[in-house]
Amino acid sequence: MERKYCNNCGNFGHIYKHCRHPILSYGIILYDDSIPDNIKIVMIERKDSISYIEFLRGKYKSHTNIDYIKLLLSRFSVDEKQRIISNDFDELWKQLWIHTETINPRVKREYTISKRNFNRIKDGFEYEGKSYNLQSLIEETDTLYESNEWELPKGRRNLRENNRECAIREFQEETNITHTNYDLITNIVPLIEEYTGINNVRYKHVYYIGRVKEPCELKINMMNKDQYTEVKSISWFNQEECNTSIREYDSHKKKVVNEFFDFIKMNNQLIQMK
């Protein structure tokens, strides 16, 4: 009998849904030090905000969970707020997944319930003596994010993939930068980002450090399905640009980015000598 294998932590003896570890992702912080006093790293802007995806998938349990729905809506970009008001659910679902025929079966099963909940909110409902609809809920959120979340390239492991293999593959999928374009710094312990999301799920992101061999152009490749279905834009950012672009509630993300820059500024010459 084949031993149970967990595709989250990579250990045997249990399966993914019984794993006690946080949801694990692996990525690479790739830096360019060709201008020593202006070191930059690769950052990506998500195609869709996390909260936007959660809302369309109906992850608020009930349309009467007003506070949580408003929290999700408050983290939409300006474009996402306009999009969700202007389109019906089927169009939004198609835009979200793009290739709907290849959606994970588990996500595909969410479609009917998600659509019903969305339409109930959009059409309007009464709760505790007050009327709500999607337009009014959005109008009660005053955030004006001009972009979606910026973050470090990362992702979850494939079956039987080790941590480093996962990081290299996910980084290439999201950036189009292959492992031949950079050196992984093997004598540096990966940086860890760990937090609990607003959905009360624990996450842990493990980032290896890579140094680009020579500056390379960053762009969205429309031939790379793994990239254009998840990434809206990609850029080289210095420390100040990272802190400006990362949203204020993502303090855990800012922390790991600043830890990286502080470490590199102190140790980059030693790294280059090894």
What are these regions (language model features)?
Residues K40-I41:
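Entry beta-strands of beta-propeller and related beta-repeat scaffolds
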Residues K59, L72-R75, L92, L96-K265, ...:
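Unchanged
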Residues R3-H14:
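Short Cys/His-rich zinc-binding micro-motifs
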Residues I35-P36, D48-S51, K213-E217:
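Short, charged/polar surface micro-motifs in flexible loops or helix N-caps
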Residues E45-S62:
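Short, solvent-exposed beta-strand-terminating loops
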Residues Y60-I84:
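E2/UBC-UEV (E2-variant) core
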Residues Y26-L30:
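Short beta-strand scaffold segments in enzyme catalytic cores
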Residues Y16-R20:
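Cysteine-centered loop/knuckle micro-motif
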